[in-house]
Amino acid sequence: AKAFDAEYCCAGQEAVKQKMLEIMNNKEATAVEQSLATTLEVCYEFYLRGYHFDPINIYESDATHFVISENGLIPPFVAVSGLGESAALATVEQRAGKHFISVEEFSLCCNKLSKTHIDTLRALGSFAGMPDTSQISLFG
C-alpha cells in the first residue's frame, strides 16, 4: 500500500472524494499523486460499502499490514507519510507488551519515529486522549 496515505484515506468519505477529484482534475499531477488518486478511488468504494478506517492504533496497528476491526480496517504504521518499513517494524517490536501513559513515553520507547511522525500520529488520532507528557501537576 505504498500509495495509501492515512492522512487522506482515513479522513472519511467526503474528504476522500474531494482529494480524489482534486488530483484527477490536476493536469500536472505527479505519478505519485496519480497513484494516490487510484488508491483514493478504492477507499471511496470502501466507504460507499459501509466500511471505515479506524485511526492508526499504537497498540494494534501492524507495521506493514492492515488489521481487521469491526466494520473496517486499522491501517499499518507505514501508512503514515514518510514512515518507512524499518521504522514501522522497529515500532511494533519496541511497543510489544508495553502500556504507555503519555505520548512522550511512546516517543522515547519507539525511537525510530521522528517528531514529524509523532505529530502526524497525534493528528490522526492515534493517541486517543493520551497526555503529551508523563508529568503530573500536584497543584493544578
Map each language-model feature to its residues.
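Noncatalytic, beta-rich nucleic-acid-contacting surfaces in large DNA/RNA-processing enzymes
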Residues: A1-G140
